[in-house]
């Protein structure tokens, strides 16, 4: 019996600007990448994306993406409320822990809402190992499915 390959599901894309962008499909792989980059002293210049089904959606569908209800999208108030709670209580908390910055507050918060999607923006300036940088996290949910996009970027100051 062969062992299942547990390598992270990640693709590296080069943008039009020549920037290298890592795209993840798994929340745990995304968080592990941020943690590893922090430990490797590469924490202040990262850009990566995560596209995933939130854990509460998968739990509701018994971990079967085929059984996810079509109504789980940005037009569903319950879905939006649960997604916002997931982002605030789990995703951002896990990012803080990966950065070894549990006191991080993400003071720069905003929300953009259109018919097509809802976007939450989180930003904060911080310092780690005497290096100042800005963290930007953008979370987007769309009107047509339960898939969520997270854009994580750190910029040296």
Curated annotation (Swiss-Prot):
Say yes or no: keyword Membrane present: yes
Question: What keywords does the record list, in alphabetical order?
Answer: Cell membrane, Membrane
- Please tell me one Gene Ontology term that the record gives under cellular component: plasma membrane
Annotated membrane topology: Peripheral membrane protein
- Cite the Pfam families for this sequence: RGI1
State whether keyword Membrane applies.
yes
Q: Which GO terms describe its biological process?
A: energy reserve metabolic process
InterPro entries according to UniProt: RGI1, RGI1_sf
Q: What is this protein called?
A: Respiratory growth induced protein 1
Species name:
Candida glabrata (strain ATCC 2001 / BCRC 20586 / JCM 3761 / NBRC 0622 / NRRL Y-65 / CBS 138)
Name of the coding gene: RGI1
């Amino acid at each position: 019996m062969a062992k299942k390959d547990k390598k992270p599901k990640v693709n590296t894309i080069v943008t039009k600007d020549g920037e290298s962008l890592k795209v993840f499909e798994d929340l745990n792989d995304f968080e592990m990448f941020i943690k590893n980059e922090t430990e490797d002293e590469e924490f202040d210049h990262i850009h990566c994306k995560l596209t995933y089904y939130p854990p509460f959606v998968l739990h509701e569908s018994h971990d079967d993406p085929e059984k996810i209800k079509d109504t789980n999208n940005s037009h569903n108030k319950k879905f939006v409320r649960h997604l916002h709670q997931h982002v605030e209580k789990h995703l951002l908390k896990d990012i803080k822990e990966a950065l070894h910055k549990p006191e991080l507050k993400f003071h720069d918060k905003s929300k953009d809402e259109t018919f097509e999607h809802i976007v939450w923006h989180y930003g904060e300036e911080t310092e780690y190992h005497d290096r100042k940088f800005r963290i930007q996290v953008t979370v987007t949910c769309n009107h047509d499915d339960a898939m969520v996009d997270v854009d994580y970027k750190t910029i040296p100051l």
